[in-house]
Design a protein with these regions (language model features):
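Short helix-capping segments at alpha-helix termini
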Residues: 21-26, 112-116, 175
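A contiguous pocket-lining binding segment that forms or flanks enzyme active sites
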Residues: 83, 87-92, 103-105, 111-117
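Hydrophobic faces of well-ordered beta-strands that scaffold small-molecule active sites
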Residues: 3-5, 28-31, 50-51, 70-73, ...
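N-terminal active-site wall of soluble small-molecule enzyme domains
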Residues: 4-68, 77-84, 102-104
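Catalytic cores of alpha/beta
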Residues: 35-45, 78-87, 109-110, 125-141
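C-terminal helical cap(s) of enzyme catalytic domains, especially alpha/beta-barrels
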Residues: 63-69, 151-175
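Glycine-rich phosphate-binding active-site loops on the catalytic face of alpha/beta enzymes
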Residues: 49-59, 92-101, 138-161
Length: 175
């Protein structure tokens, strides 16, 4: 019952508001929040959490000032340490595939295991490699745009999206 709506289009705020109103039991979050202005719009639209591809202290601070969880993006150990200093324990590993995939994430997570740091890899995660990520103890979630392609959304091909989500859930159950 969790969904992330990315701020990659002007329709994001409206989508968050519509989903939050239509499905009050669903936890709706805003992804790709890269400015404090987007953070304000996301929260005003009903977002219950936020994510970003990078670590920006102003955006993190804005979400924190509203008691709303925020997951900043990291790609290096220095990014991890910067996020920890800003009080973040849940981090988005992005772009996971291009950065080095599960092997890199395992190596980077190891020095921070005693600090309760958890990761959500996105960018390059697929049905073929998702369980490799999910097998890493420090991974709390994964993200994948393959679940709903732009073409499927544009064509309102909800049955294909539903089938892909069911396939991913079945695969994740084996992790």
């Amino acid at each position: 019952n969790i969904i992330e709506v990315t701020f990659r289009t002007a329709a994001a705020a409206g989508a968050i508001e519509s989903i939050a109103n239509a499905f009050p039991e669903m936890l709706v979050g805003a992804g790709t929040v890269v400015t404090q202005e987007q953070a304000k719009i996301a929260i005003d639209s009903g977002s219950k959490f936020g994510l970003a591809p990078g670590t920006d202290s102003e955006t993190i601070g804005y979400f924190k000032s509203h008691d709303i969880p925020f997951i900043p993006g990291i790609m290096t150990p220095s990014d991890i340490q910067a996020a920890i200093k800003l009080g973040c324990e849940h981090l988005k590993f992005f772009p996971a595939g291009a950065a080095g995939g599960p092997k890199l994430l395992k190596a980077m997570a190891a020095p921070y295991a005693n600090l309760s740091v958890k990761f959500c890899p996105t960018g390059g995660v697929s049905l073929d490699n998702m369980n490799e990520y999910l097998s890493i103890p420090e991974v709390f979630a994964i993200g994948g745009s393959w679940l709903a392609t732009k073409a499927q959304i544009a064509n309102k091909d909800w049955s294909a999206i539903t089938a892909q989500v069911k396939e991913a859930l079945a695969e994740a159950a084996q992790a």
